[in-house]
Amino acid sequence: GLGDVYKRQVEEYLERLLPADWSGMDLYQRRSFLGGSEFGGATATGIVRREKVCIMEIWCECFGKERQNLKRTDSYEIEGILKKLGGWQKTTETKTGKTHFPIYGPQKTFVRHED
């Protein structure tokens, strides 16, 4: 079903190694990198494993959607995918469960964990 397609897409996104300057890249650059297109004449090399993620990142970067279009139902669906994939849990680093993300600001945060 559609759920499986999204699940596979999200899994690939989460396992993709990122360039060292990922946090300094804007959304356009991130999408270019993830889409495999070259920008600035050279392709950035992915070397860093993603250790945290927020739903907005998955929505905008993995699915290529606009942030203002994220509905609560979409959030639940994406959170459901993270649960199904396993290996990700809500952060306990902050009381609110939110941390700051470049581009997106404070967002509910999921961190990688080894079972």
Regions found by a protein language model. Give the residues of each.
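Short, small-residue-biased leader/transition segments that mark boundaries at the very start
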Residues: 2-6
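Positively charged, polyanion-binding regions of nucleic-acid-associated proteins
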Residues: 7-52
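Positively charged interface segments
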Residues: 41-115
